[in-house]
Regions:
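Cap/insert and terminal regions of metallo-dependent hydrolase folds
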Residues: 1-4, 104-152
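Core catalytic region of metal-dependent phosphoesterases/phosphodiesterases
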Residues: 1-52, 131-132, 140-141, 166-167
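Short His-Asn-centered micro-motif
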Residues: 12-15, 47, 61, 108-109, ...
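Active-site environment of divalent metal-dependent phosphoester hydrolases
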Residues: 15-21, 51, 66-69, 112-116, ...
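Short, glycine/charged-enriched secondary-structure capping and boundary segments
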Residues: 24-28, 73-75, 120-123, 161-164
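Active-site-proximal loop/helix segment associated with metal-binding centers of metalloenzymes
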Residues: 33, 40, 53-129
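Binuclear metal-dependent phosphoesterase catalytic core
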Residues: 52-54, 126, 136-141, 152-173
Length: 173
């Protein structure tokens, strides 16, 4: 479907990706950050990167914890890389520091701790706690217009700046 669209599709990873395949692509630089170019019109925006697109700055940080990982097979339907590495956390923070913690938009798969809690989602594992805590520190320190995420499979808004997308499509400008 995406191949036939007259646009370039940009995406961040979630928690059900085949990370072995995704990470088999060469890491390249694109609009200021690291990417995997899947095809000419399909680009994976890697974790902890800042991209300038049409004059707007985007911080990206994919990944999330799979609550159903016990029913999945490692390396087939579940990959430990769903949780960010120490290097990804550190690189993301360093990239935000370079921008004085000022971006236009933040795109993540899961939400910061306080936002997830406001939506009624508790924490299920130490890995999930660490990721949501990291995103909470990013939220507390960074100036941004909107933060978009989607892990919870619902359309919702928290405090007018945190937006969970599932069925809804928004245009950023």
């Amino acid at each position: 479907v995406f191949r036939s669209l007259p646009v370039t599709t940009l995406f961040i990873d979630g928690n059900h990706e085949n990370f072995e395949q995704l990470n088999s692509y060469a890491v390249e630089q694109w609009n200021g950050g690291k990417v995997h170019i899947i095809e000419d019109n399909m680009i994976h925006l890697m974790r902890g990167q800042i991209f300038t697109i049409d004059g707007l700055k985007f911080f990206t940080f994919g990944g999330a914890y799979s609550i159903d990982k016990m029913s999945r097979a490692e390396g087939i339907s579940w990959f430990p890389e769903e949780i960010p590495s120490r290097e990804e956390y550190e690189e993301g923070w360093a990239n935000l520091e370079k921008e004085d913690f000022q971006v236009d938009y933040i795109l993540t798969h899961t939400a910061p701790r306080d936002v997830a809690a406001a939506m009624g989602y508790g924490e299920l594992s130490d890995d999930e706690v660490e990721l949501r805590q990291y995103l909470q520190r990013v939220a507390d320190k960074t100036e941004f217009q909107k933060w978009y995420f989607g892990h919870f499979h619902e359309d919702a808004e928290v405090e007018e700046v945190f937006v969970c997308l599932y069925d809804e499509v928004v245009e950023l400008s």
